[in-house]
Swiss-Prot record:
The modification Glycine amide is found at G10. Signal peptide: none annotated. This is Gonadoliberin-1. The keyword ATP-binding does not apply. InterPro entries: GnRH. The keyword Ubl conjugation does not apply. Keywords: Amidation, Hormone, Pyrrolidone carboxylic acid, Secreted. The modification Pyrrolidone carboxylic acid is found at Q1. Belongs to the GnRH family. One of its GO terms (cellular component) is extracellular region. It comes from the Eukaryota. It is found in: Secreted. It comes from Petromyzon marinus (Sea lamprey).
Amino acid sequence: QHYSLEWKPG
């Protein structure tokens, strides 16, 4: 699984 470190909830 890969998740962006730039992820921002919204």
